[in-house]
Structures are given as structure tokens and as C-alpha cells.
Amino acid sequence: MKKKYRIAVLPGDGIGPEVMQEAYKILNILKDHFLLPLEMKEFNIGGIAIDQEGIALPKNTLLGCENSDAILFGSVGGKKWDYLSIDKRPERAALLPLRKHFNLFSNLRPAKLYADLKYLSPLRSNIIKDGFDILCVRELTGGIYFGKPNGHSKKNDIEYAFDTEVYYDYEISRIAHLAFQLARNRKKKVCSLDKSNVLKSSILWKEIVEKISKNYPDVHLSHLYIDNAIMQIIKDPSQFDVILCSNLFGDIVSDECAAITGSIGMLPSASLNEKNFGLYEPAGGSAPDIAGKNIANPIAQILSVSMLVRHGMNLKKIADKIDESVVSVLKQGYRTADISNNSHNYLKTSEMGDIIANFLINGK
């Protein structure tokens, strides 16, 4: 490993700063106890950057990210900035430009049902008896969100709007390669989602994925139409391992997978480019209604650190230790308010961070 592994820390708005404080506890243990050569520098982003510097993504923040090996992101946005035009609000003017600037073409969204949190899932107990551990791999920079032409117009008093789904073979190839590589370290199954019975772009998607799969004979590939996949995820989520999908389909499916865990505050995510530079963040939002109350769940932010260690630093064993610490804490019955089944007995944000940190060091 290089002399220093530099992390740009962007706490942002809402609950971002307080859950990031708990992530710092883990980072400092990795630095002091596991002797990882980490260097963390903090920068403004989102609403706080608008308030202090007049723009959601300041130049010095972008420069700080460019001079780093990874980005650890909190959350951005809140009603405070709703007076701004949509393109200048934190949600649009901070995260999307970061993704574009660093060409973060892939989004990894784990959706895991923890054995001790099955009561949170909206699915029936007989459906989730075996639990599930799904990784959604979503193409992030192509597809209908970015295709041209698009527009909104009017002709002969008839209003209409249109978008264009465009995928190039190289865009599909690189996300498929990543999905298969990730599956090799899991249950060795990839399910690719498409709508190839209707869409030309999906026909190409399926053809390219089939072609790429020949490089990974140890990984089983299956295909599902997106409408059937949505149903199958609800009926039997345990059948899935890695789900590979386009930008639009991934946007939908990753949220569905998150919803059936019943605990969005537990779910991290990673967005990576071809050089393995990544942005790591919780899957949930800024939750301004509970900001500053010390009741937010910090586990998604802590598990984002785990993903950074796993995918950014390629230190699987240490990432596993972070994950195991979270599992151990849950097994012993520790809960924050959002995952507690007892409204009068739960930990504060800082308390949960302390307990996970203690498990990471001492294993108890």
C-alpha cells in the first residue's frame, strides 16, 4: 500500500455531520489500532457550502477530492434550500457533479437482512426465513437519464415530452465485468435485468452481458425481465446474489431491495470509476427532521467505511471485521430508534458508534 491513503470527508447537511462523527471513530481505530496509513481531510459540500461559500460544490472541495484516493460522503439537502432553483439545490448541485467529474459509472447497493432485524422487514416471515444478501450493481452514467435527444414541447396544441435510452457496448461491458468480479467473492451468481422483449437497448444489453459472461465460467448468469424481477424480489429475495441493471432499472430495483430490509439507516453504497476511485455514502438521505437530536442511525455511514476499505483499499479481512462488529452489536440487542422494537429503549447515535468501535477493538 502507498505511504498515505487520503480520504476526502464530506459530512454535508442534516444528519450527515453527526453520523460522520461515528465514522471517524472507526477510521481512527483503523489508523491507530490496525495501523492503516489513513489521512482524512474534511470539506464543505451541499447546503452548508451554499451558506458559507455560495455554491453547493466549491472549487476547494472538488480539488480536495481530486487530491484524495476516496471520498467518504455524508448527506446533502433539506427544506432550508428549497427556495433555490432545482438545479442549484444541494441534492442536484453537489452529488451529481461529483459523479460526473469522477466518471463514477457504477453504483453498488448492498441490501442485507440481518438475522436479528427480521422483524423490520415488511415481507411475511415465511418469505424471509432464510434471510437475503443482495448486491445491486447499477450502471450510473448511461441510459435514459443521459440520452439525447430529450425535451418537452408542444405541437398543434398537443403537449408532449420525450427521453432517449442510449447504451454503448463499452458502457455495458465495464459494468458487466464489475458485476461478475464482485460475484466471484460472493455466491457466484449474477442476475441481469432487462426488457429485451420490447427495448432495443435491452437487446444489446443482454447480448453484451452474455458475451462478457464467457470470461467468468465460475459465475452463473441468469436473465429476468424487469417486471418479473420486481415480482421475484418480493416473492423470494433469497434467490438473488448480484443483480446487474441499467441506470433506470437499477434506480428502481435498488430502492425496492432497500425497502424490503425495512432499515434504510443500515444500508451503505459505493460509486466507483474505472480507476477504482470511489465515493462511499449511506443509501438514505439527510433526514433534517432528526438532525442534531443524536438519534440517527450511524450504521450505514460506518458500513460505508467498510465498503471503502473493501473496494477502495482492497483489504477484505479488515472490512469483514467492521461488518462483524456491526453484526455482533445487533446480536447483543443494541438498537438505535429507527430499528428498535421498543420505543423507550434505544441508543443515541454517539452511543451506537462507541459500542461498534469497542467491538472492533476488543471483539466484545
Swiss-Prot record:
Listed Pfam families? Iso_dh (PF00180)
What's the name of the protein? 3-isopropylmalate dehydrogenase
The note on cofactor binding and number reads: Binds 1 Mg(2+) or Mn(2+) ion per subunit.
Task: Please name the source species.
Answer: Buchnera aphidicola subsp. Uroleucon erigeronensis
Q: Which reaction does it catalyse?
A: (2R,3S)-3-isopropylmalate + NAD(+) = 4-methyl-2-oxopentanoate + CO2 + NADH
Q: Specify the pathway.
A: Amino-acid biosynthesis; L-leucine biosynthesis; L-leucine from 3-methyl-2-oxobutanoate: step 3/4
List keywords of the entry alphabetically: Amino-acid biosynthesis, Branched-chain amino acid biosynthesis, Cytoplasm, Leucine biosynthesis, Magnesium, Manganese, Metal-binding, NAD, Oxidoreductase, Plasmid
Q: Name the residues that bind Mg(2+).
A: D227, D251, D255
What are the record's GO terms for cellular component?
cytosol
Q: Where in the cell is it found?
A: Cytoplasm
Quote the subunit structure annotation: Homodimer.
- Needs which cofactor? Mg(2+); Mn(2+)
What is this organism's lineage?
Answer: Bacteria, Pseudomonadati, Pseudomonadota, Gammaproteobacteria, Enterobacterales
PROSITE patterns registered for this protein in UniProt: IDH_IMDH
Amino acids binding substrate: R99, R109, R138, D227
The UniProt entry, under InterPro entries, shows:
IsoCit/isopropylmalate_DH_CS, IsoPropMal-DH-like_dom, Isopropylmalate_DH
Say which enzyme class the record assigns. oxidoreductase
One Gene Ontology BP term is: L-leucine biosynthetic process
Query: Primary place of residence?
Result: cytoplasm
**Catalytic activity, EC:** 1.1.1.85
Residues the entry annotates as binding NAD(+): 78-91, 285-297
The UniProt GO MF terms for this protein read:
3-isopropylmalate dehydrogenase activity; magnesium ion binding; NAD binding
Q: Where is this site: Important for catalysis?
A: Y145, K195
* Family of this protein: Belongs to the isocitrate and isopropylmalate dehydrogenases family. LeuB type 1 subfamily.
Please, which domain of life does this record's source organism belong to? Bacteria
Q: What does this protein do?
A: Catalyzes the oxidation of 3-carboxy-2-hydroxy-4-methylpentanoate (3-isopropylmalate) to 3-carboxy-4-methyl-2-oxopentanoate. The product decarboxylates to 4-methyl-2 oxopentanoate.
